[in-house]
Amino acid sequence: MNHERILEKRETILQYCHRLTEMHRAALFDEEESPRNLSLQQLRKNIHICLKDLCRLNTWLTEQDGGFRKALGSLERYESKLAALLAKERQLGEERQAWEAAVPAGAGDDSGGVFTVHGGHQRHLNAYIESMGVDNTGLGKEPDALPRLSRQQALGHVAVLRLAQAAVSREISQAEGLLKSFRKDQTFIKAELAKLEAFVRAQKLAVERELEGVRRSQEHIFRKIGLLKLPAREREPLGLGRRPAADLESMKAQMEEFLHVRKSALKAMLSEHKQETQLLKSQQEVWKEVTTLVEDLEDRIRTRFATAAKVDPVELRRLITDAITQIKSLHYEESYPDVLTCIRDEIAALEKANDQLPFSKQKSITDKLVPVNTGAGFLVNSTSPPKVGLTKSIVPSSSMATNKKSV
């Protein structure tokens, strides 16, 4: 059972004890309001049971594996878990930031990839144009015009053009092979880029999911320690990739102070209830002694009336006075208010009973005394005296003695 449940039960018992105190007073002084279903002796016993139960609950709260120490241990464990979660959150935040980093410097520098193509056919072509003249070639105003050439000139130009044609064909073939290689490289680069970009997205998503799990764990602990009151289903969900709620961030800022206050409060309650346990044990003993003294008095009065035809009121006064003196000698001043009230009510009831006893200095007191009858009245007519053991249940039907004791 956790300390909150124990404290709730303790509060219930305290309220019941207060109600018993009121019933105890009514049973002692108020005949009309006296509880019908509980005797005075049972009320006294129930008050003692309440004190015993309170003592037991306090022991559960303060023992080595009790409620307060368990709560303190839980808070310390939660504090440790939260510290680990916050460290994990910082680490994941840094990791996410690293995945968002720009392309490293120099990655776009392509100066080392310059290709220089040398056109060997240009030499032959330039020689031909220079020999023929630009205007006498297809570059002139009349592309189809052909100057008068000697056989040697014509064959020479043909030879040069054939060399140029062979050279340019070779160079085109080389260029086409290079372009094909470039296109092949392009296809490979696209495939590799798509694969690696998918990998980066997956890694970033994994970091986000892990961050989400960390935040949910934090929220769970905040709810456990009482910093977050609303149940999870009533809170806005923290979706993947979304920023945490503002109140969750606020709770992180309050966490250290909140835990410090909670632990300080639990330690203070632990110390307070440990002291209270000793007080409760002492009060159990005091109340037990009080009820024992009162019930012993009742038994002695009952026995005296059962064994003597007449009883001197002076003897009764002495018995009651002795009981009052013994009760007052007990250390009960620091008792619970309800226990203190019950003890004082017992004393007041005894004193009232003592005051209502006639004095034996008179010549005869039998005229002022009546036999105990079937009613619940006290030994003096027309009174509703306290129930201190001098009612019909204790005193048999007999008369009080005169000045002279009759044994």
Swiss-Prot record:
Transmembrane segments: none annotated. The keyword Cytoplasm applies. GO terms for biological process: autophagy; protein transport. Residues 74-101 form a coiled coil. Keywords: Autophagy, Coiled coil, Cytoplasm, Membrane, Protein transport, Transport. The keyword Cytoplasm applies. GO terms for cellular component: cytoplasm; membrane. It is found in: Cytoplasm; Membrane. Belongs to the ATG23 family. Required for cytoplasm to vacuole transport (Cvt) vesicle formation and efficient autophagy. Plays a role in ATG protein retrieval from the pre-autophagosomal structure (PAS) and is especially required for autophagy-dependent cycling of ATG9. Also plays a role in regulation of filamentous growth. This is Autophagy-related protein 23. It comes from Eremothecium gossypii (strain ATCC 10895 / CBS 109.51 / FGSC 9923 / NRRL Y-1056).
